[in-house]
Amino acid sequence: MKTVRGFASATVGNVACGFDVLGFAITEPGDEVILTLHEERKSECPVSITAISGDGGALPLDPKKNTSSFVVLKFLEYIRTSKGIDFKGHIDLELKKNLPLSSGMGSSAASAAAALAAANELLGQPCSKMELVHFAVEGERVACGSAHADNAAPAILGNFVLIRSYAPLDLITIPSPEHLFCTLVHPHTELKTSFARSVLPRSIPLKTATQQWGNVGALIAGLLKSDYDLIGRALVDVVAEPKRAPLIPGFLDVKHAAIDCGALGCSIAGSGPSVFAFSSSKETAERVGQAMREAFLLPETNLKSDMWVSPICKEGAKVL
């Protein structure tokens, strides 16, 4: 019997102007998955979920419906058909959720990435990290009905990841400037990803599209040049944020508080309700976080929140 513990951290998808094509990982918080290998098959399905903690009973125990176990099943199928590894044993899976559900923090992607890191290690690392991304993306389809990669890819690979194409999946990792820090604030409210996507327009004017393209190009350039001023100027979302901002109580107050306190920029994390900000020092990022939390507590909103300050995670999913 062999046991492996996998860990993957929170991620932020979209990054303001990079709707569905850009995301990054932070160092904490994150989900942990513990896999135990048994020599003999216990059931027809080679993976069983033995325990889930931290989800309040919300996540399914059916291995074909839970993101963390589903991606392990896809991984086992792939190594059988593509690597010639016919797994005859059984895997028990324990999931420790440290990320809130429906938070905009890449909760499902973290579970999938942690499970894949552990499974790959458990079976002798037959797959590269880039191969693992494909399974994590399929896990997103189970979680929310859409196989998007802006959380799944950085959860596996770390750093910033640009999705150039989905068919075929073409990913570009982008290093983070040394002193770039993320403040992530999660208000104690829930916003379903499916609903947040439903408010978005099916088409946008060409003028709006060119604004968004200019901003995402500038953001990539700012990251590569370590140009913090350019990063701040580029963190403008003219597509999703205007539609989603009304869904997050107090968002505009929180954003203004972050900017007034010295943040380079501030926007919605993924589909929300979490909000992120970038700063060029840890000290500024911590001050920004306190200001954002205080803004959520204003009388018209009065929402408690959790806060994390982190550099960009450079290694992605890992084995503990």
From Swiss-Prot:
ATP binds at P100, L101, S102, S103, G104, M105, G106, S107, S108, A109, A110. Pathway: Amino-acid biosynthesis; L-threonine biosynthesis; L-threonine from L-aspartate: step 4/5. It is an enzyme of class 2 (transferase). It catalyses: L-homoserine + ATP = O-phospho-L-homoserine + ADP + H(+). Keywords: Amino-acid biosynthesis, ATP-binding, Cytoplasm, Kinase, Nucleotide-binding, Threonine biosynthesis, Transferase. It is found in: Cytoplasm. GO terms for cellular component: cytoplasm. Catalyzes the ATP-dependent phosphorylation of L-homoserine to L-homoserine phosphate. Belongs to the GHMP kinase family. Homoserine kinase subfamily. This is Homoserine kinase.
